[in-house]
Amino acid sequence: MNMPVNKSPMINTCGGISSPYHEELWKLNFQHLSGERGHKSRPTFSITKEFILRFNQTQNSKEKEELLELARKIILRCKRKLGLKTLGSGRHVHLPAAWTEVIYLAQCKGEIQDESLNMLYASLDHASFDYDHLPALFFVAESVLYRLCCDASLKTYLYSVEIKLAKIGYLVFLRLFIFFLHGHLESFKQHLLRLQPYLYALSFSGASYHKYPNIFSNVQFILKASEIIGKRELRSESIFRPVEDKKRYENTDSDMGGYEINHLLWHCVAAWSCVQNNSPQLNNVLEHLVFHKTQLQKKCWLDSVLALLVLGEAAKLNMACLKALMDVVRDFVSSIMSVQNQEESCKVDDFSWAWNVVYIYTVILAEICLYAATSDLRKTALIGFCHCKSSQKNILYLDKSVPPELKETSILSLLEYFSSKMSENCDQVVWTGYYGLVYNLVKISWELQGDEEQDGLRNMIWQTLQKTKDYEEDVRIQNAINIAQAELNDPTDPFTRYSTNISSNVGEEVFSKYIGWRIANTLSKLFFPPIEAHFLPLKKPSIKKDQTKYPNKKLESVKKQVLHFTVREHPSVSEIPMFPYPDFFTKADKELAKIIDHHWQEELKIREKEDAICKAQELKDKKLAEKNHFQEVMKKREEKLHKQTKPYELPYRKEVI
């Protein structure tokens, strides 16, 4: 896919990974990925710098086919190490090594690059949170930032690879932010410092990506997460100036590394926990959650995004949570639009960041529409609670003289509301929300093809998209359709293949299916640790040799940072102590698995010895039986023929001289 964009100047425009830091990583990771000692030879299919250069530069068709075959073998090996079919679990899975290998393989152009990035995105989506993943996550983060800042900046057009890199970067920094909340980034300051030049360059990408919210939203999330982490972990070393949310950090204990979460995020995690545990306190929690809905208007919108992600996961299982989610966002959009409509500019809060929250909400709605537990939840996310015929009949509000009132924030209601306010100079929240809805509807329609049970839902989405395509003249919204089609790598028109069954791309993940649940589960353990967790020993996680990223650097002591989550109205849960991840029981399970495996191997050896003894005894008995049988035959022969010679044996003759 290529679309014209205006690229901004970036730093370090040399091609490939060529810095001394990456040169060292080549050597270190190749030794680790091959799994061989120094005296053993590397397998023929290991990734090398020469292999990547030959793959991209060769003109010989025969050699190109051989290299492609080798790359496909590596792809198969990586799929197994990533555990794509087992959600990243199993004895054969080693995520840090696989992530590093896949990000190297993604430098091979063509189908190998696309499949590698698809695999990496799927793995980062469903993998669990493990402290041992951090070195590999930082390496993937630096590689993605390098590609976005250097390789992408040299291109005149927008490529589908940029979209995939931005999505991967979003997942990586989302994971890093969760580790930051656990206090696990204190010993990774050098890793954070290495990201600063690339983050600085990425901060100038607004001119390149502002027309494409699906990319720009991911970029803004990366920058915001890095800014917050940098303020807390790097202090003066960060390239970001602490100009925002100074009061947010003044009321926390800087010596203890405190980070104040807002009430909305806390209650969203509590609501998710209630849904998971089928708690009768859910309604009370949701009442308090709606009471704190104004916290969604806080300038530190990263907490708001996390809150919506967690509440969206609860909404996939519970209708009351879905209603609370829609009510909170409805109030947020109404408040933002009322502020933007005020003519008085004095002392009006700056909501230039609000479009990020609105766009991510459209993604959450799309995921609910696809992956909710019941058909009622999926239908409600699309149509809403009113079930009005007008909402189904007038999908696009063509008469803009009387703008409709925003009664709820389902997909069709928001589509009607934003389309009525579209203009060339409309607010960014309006056209970004409209863009996100159309962009995600195309992907939903593509995802639902072939699913007969969802035909009614897909028919309504198809009609909506058809009207948008026919009547919407705004170039930005037309771009949403074109980019979504190109991202799906689908050369055909989705509006002309309604009755055609077409298989989806192998390994292509349209939406992130599991990361929201992983985050909700992790934050629930962080905010509401079980009572027995307070008696767990505070151990330092060990750092393995094969996960040491820098051989010339001394290992720093992994001193865990204790965060204090300040929730003023809940003193009982303030200052919750953090414990290293993974916890005691996870480690105990791993040790138990090792013990079981050890005893199983010993039992296999004993069985092999017993089998060998049995086979030897059987062979001995067989030979003895043959010997006895032969002696019996000779005895009968002697009795009948009075001969002692063996059958067919001539008697001995003395030669007469």
Curated annotation (Swiss-Prot):
Source organism, top-level taxon: Eukaryota
Alphabetized UniProt keyword annotations: Cilium biogenesis/degradation, Membrane, Transmembrane, Transmembrane helix
GO cellular component: membrane; outer dense fiber
Main subcellular localisation: membrane
Protein's cellular compartments: Membrane
Membrane topology: Multi-pass membrane protein
The protein, known as: Transmembrane protein 232
The species this protein was found in: Homo sapiens
Organism ancestry: Eukaryota, Metazoa, Chordata, Craniata, Vertebrata
